[in-house]
Amino acid sequence: MNKVIEWFYNFLWGDLFTLHFGDVSIGIPLLVLLLIPAGIFFTIRTKFMPVRKLPQMIRALGDKNDDKTSLSTFQTLIVSTATRVGMGNLVGVVAAISIGGAGAVFWMWASALLGASTAYVEGTLAQLHKKKDPLYGGYHGGPAYYIHDFVEQKRKKKLKKSFLAILFAFFGLICWCGISQVISNSVTSAFKNAFSIPPIYTTAVLVALAAVIVLRKNATVKFLDVIVPVMAVLYFAVTVFIILKNIKLMPGVFSRIFQEAFGFKQIAGGGFGAVLMNGVKRGLFSNEAGSGSAPCAAAAAEGKRPETVGMVQSLGVLIDTIVICTCTAMIMLLAPREITDGLQDRKSVV
């Protein structure tokens, strides 16, 4: 099983080919090859929407929801943020900086801006192709739905099913089940390492909590409405406290980020590719732009205008990477180097 997982990981994140620029080598994984050009294309086509319409993104959170069976734009942001924020914001950032240096943080920011454009397109398409749920009320949808609709448009006839939509739904199910296992495994490992609690007990508590939330109608959204803002604010507050305690070191931290992102030392040493790719890969893994998970939440929103829901999804990417990942990066870069050098696995965070 481990060999199968390792093969899939190398297929998706291993170097598909390598670009050589003098002494600099940049390995390009398959997912980076797919997601970064898509992000650049969407950014240009939307005329740099994440930067241009940031005020409108924030104002869109105040839109009222007249249909109580569907989600408001704010609730879709909460749900999509809950899907985006996870181990990538902690372990991913630690690994990116440990392997690629402080300069990887800059390339995480850059990938977030491209990912925000992708998320905008995903969210807007999910709204345009959402379906009314006759059983539970509200709406449902996502990439499988708009892929199916596009196949119908291409073939110019109604279809009961389409192979591409089924393929996406199948691999999406595998992906999201796997992600939840990664998170639960990290939680059980953390409690075992910190408090010597056997994983079976932590797992039982997690299953019980999940059952209480999932089996009650609308309990998932209500729970996330409370827990996501609280956790984000607390994490941000802790980071601000640490920054204020070390405010004199901040100019050096930002100088280190930009120097190592574009530094001649990294280029001359052939390490520029590691800085660039580790920042980009960890940024893409963290914000999930292009993975197809967040559009399912976007489709559940009432949304008077599809564009508004798309902008809120774009804001979710910026919150995930520009805010939360940066918090982790600042905490790590303010710590003494002898503590942080070489930390590449989840135990370094625990």
Could you describe each region identified by the protein language model?
Residues M1-M87, I97-A104, G115:
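N-terminal alpha-helical transmembrane segments of multi-pass membrane transport
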Residues L34-A38, F42-I58, L164, N185-F191, ...:
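Membrane-interface loop-to-helix entry segments
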Residues R84-L90, F106-T118, L167-G178, L315-C327:
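Membrane-embedded alpha-helical segments of transport systems
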Residues L114-E122, T202-K217, V228-K248, K281, ...:
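Selective recognition of specific alpha-helical transmembrane segments in multi-pass small-molecule
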